[in-house]
């Protein structure tokens, strides 16, 4: 009789080819058997009857701000929040840690913190700016999963924006290195001029902010970045895409063979500009949240498989930085704990979006795109990463439920349908019934070349 480390019995397993009732056996942190019924014994047996077993999610876009801005968030608190939402891995952005991840020294400083403090697995983005073109090779050797650049001002002076020369030379280099570039796409000149004009005329409200960053700023820049990618052969990922027209540009480029993808974020699917007026600065982000008509079209693009993955763009700050006029306060939303629950509520329950596609958007595609081996789906030989979900459990998110350093989110007070009861990383339970139940066991994820 076979003996395993872990058996999950009687669950509804969200596999790449569909949802089916099955048992899952785990040994040495890997999935070794999936069958209707698995005989044998295990060190641990979990009865998952009534639960859906999703692949643990990988959040491709977080700002945990560690080291250097730990008064905003830390790897400890951020990774705990991710686990509470069914997360098993994240890719941390090269800002707003300080110093930014622009060379090997600062990569290794961040790595040392994560090795000590990260509850879940982690990968790191390197930065591409006008000041570090000579550092791309050393960052690639460190094992970055890709590079991040801003076409407009990043919000902090220590991470300069990518000008056209940097885009050309940088993308040529990254094409040779075989690593992707993710770009925050907003036209620098238009956003700068409109913002300055608005401030000069004391127009600092929610709608003034929207007017200073209109859809054309994203649409134009996405088009230009696609042109750079097409000419250089660099794999391109459009960050936090917010307009359906920009998604269409990506789909058209992919149809003609350009290696380009886009991610979107939950708040572009769940919130509208009217919600931002109601919620205030807690819902300020860049690009801004758009109107209801665009949101409806974004859902259409999601159903048509034009969006590769959904991330949180978790970007917290000291709450004091959210006090003041909307135009002037920090832009960023705290959301890494609610990505899966949000999609279960708004996609599956509200719009009958398939569970398999939710698993693809939150786990499978992001690991495939970034060449992370053995992660992102429930299949033989893959890491035993699971989120156990009660699909019909309804709850109201309370501030005290959040594991963030600051208990702040635009979703506090919202009603969700679909909750995570347990998160398992490589066969070890790390979160269960509202509590973190493991020491940090995260490992560094590198692209598999």
UniProtKB/Swiss-Prot annotation:
* Domain of life of the organism encoding this protein: Bacteria
One GO term describing the cellular component: cytoplasm
What pathway annotation does it carry?
A: Nitrogen metabolism; (S)-allantoin degradation; allantoate from (S)-allantoin: step 1/1
Please state the Enzyme Commission number of this protein. Answer: 3.5.2.5
Keyword set, alphabetical order:
Hydrolase, Metal-binding, Purine metabolism, Zinc
Chain's role: Catalyzes the conversion of allantoin (5-ureidohydantoin) to allantoic acid by hydrolytic cleavage of the five-member hydantoin ring.
Q: How is the cofactor bound?
A: Binds 2 Zn(2+) ions per subunit.
Q: Which one GO biological process term can you cite for this protein?
A: purine nucleobase catabolic process
Entry binding sites for Zn(2+) 1: 61, 63, 148, 313
From the Swiss-Prot or TrEMBL record, give the protein name: Allantoinase
| Gene name of the encoded protein | allB
Where on the chain is N6-carboxylysine found, per UniProt? 148
**What is any Pfam family matched here?**
Amidohydro_1
User: In what way is this protein post-translationally modified?
Assistant: Carboxylation allows a single lysine to coordinate two zinc ions.
Question: Where does this protein hold Zn(2+) 2?
Answer: 148, 184, 240
Molecular function terms from GO: allantoinase activity; cobalt ion binding; zinc ion binding
The subunit structure is:
Homotetramer.
Cofactor(s) demanded: Zn(2+)
Which InterPro entries would you find in this protein's record? Allantoinase (IPR017593), Allantoinase_bact (IPR047604), Amidohydro-rel (IPR006680), DHOase/Allantoinase_Hydrolase (IPR050138), Metal-dep_hydrolase_composite (IPR011059), Metal_Hydrolase (IPR032466)
Matching entries from Gene3D superfamilies are given as: Metal-dependent hydrolases, Urease, subunit C, domain 1
Q: Which family does it belong to?
A: Belongs to the metallo-dependent hydrolases superfamily. Allantoinase family.
> Which reaction equations make up its catalytic activity?
(S)-allantoin + H2O = allantoate + H(+)
Report the source organism: Desulfitobacterium hafniense (strain DSM 10664 / DCB-2)
């Amino acid at each position: 009789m076979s003996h395993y480390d872990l058996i999950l019995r009687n669950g509804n397993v969200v596999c790449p080819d569909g949802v089916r009732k099955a048992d899952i056996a785990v040994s040495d942190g890997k999935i070794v058997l999936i069958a209707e019924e698995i005989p044998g014994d295990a060190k641990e047996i979990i009865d998952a009857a009534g639960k859906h077993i999703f692949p643990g999610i990988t959040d491709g876009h977080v700002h945990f701000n560690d080291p250097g801005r730990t008064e905003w968030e830390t790897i400890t608190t951020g990774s705990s929040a991710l686990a509470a939402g069914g997360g098993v891995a994240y890719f941390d952005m090269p800002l707003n840690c300080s110093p930014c991840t622009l060379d090997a020294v600062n990569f290794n400083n961040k790595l040392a913190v994560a090795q000590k403090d990260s509850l879940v697995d982690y990968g790191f983005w390197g930065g591409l700016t006008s000041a570090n073109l000579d550092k791309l090779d050393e960052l690639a050797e460190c094992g970055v999963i890709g590079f991040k650049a801003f076409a407009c001002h990043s919000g902090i002076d220590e991470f300069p924006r990518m000008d056209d020369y940097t885009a050309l030379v940088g993308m040529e280099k990254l094409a040779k290195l075989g690593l992707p570039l993710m770009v925050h796409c907003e036209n620098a000149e238009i956003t700068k001029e409109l913002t300055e004009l608005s401030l000069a005329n004391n127009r600092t409200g929610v709608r003034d902010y929207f007017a200073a960053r209109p859809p054309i700023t994203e649409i134009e820049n996405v088009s230009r970045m696609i042109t750079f990618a097409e000419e250089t052969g660099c794999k391109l990922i459009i960050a936090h895409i917010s307009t359906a027209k920009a998604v269409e540009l990506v789909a058209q480029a992919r149809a003609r063979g350009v290696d380009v993808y886009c991610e979107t974020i939950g708040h572009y699917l769940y919130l509208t500009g009217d919600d931002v007026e109601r919620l205030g600065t807690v819902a300020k982000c860049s690009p801004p949240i758009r109107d209801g008509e665009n949101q409806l079209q974004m859902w259409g693009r999601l159903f048509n498989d034009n969006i590769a993955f959904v991330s949180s763009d978790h970007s917290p700050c000291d709450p004091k930085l959210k006090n003041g006029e909307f135009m002037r306060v920090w832009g960023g939303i705290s959301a890494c704990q609610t990505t899966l629950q949000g999609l279960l509520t708004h996609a599956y329950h509200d719009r009958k979006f398939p569970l398999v596609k939710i698993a693809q958007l939150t786990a499978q595609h992001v690991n495939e795109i970034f060449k992370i081996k053995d992660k992102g789906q429930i299949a033989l030989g893959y890491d035993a990463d699971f989120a156990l979900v009660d699909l019909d459990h309804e709850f109201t998110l309370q501030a005290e439920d959040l594991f963030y350093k600051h208990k702040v989110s635009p979703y506090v007070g919202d009603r969700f349908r679909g909750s995570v009861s347990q998160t398992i990383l490589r066969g070890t339970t790390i979160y269960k019934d509202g509590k973190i139940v493991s020491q940090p066991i995260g490992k560094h994820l590198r692209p598999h070349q």
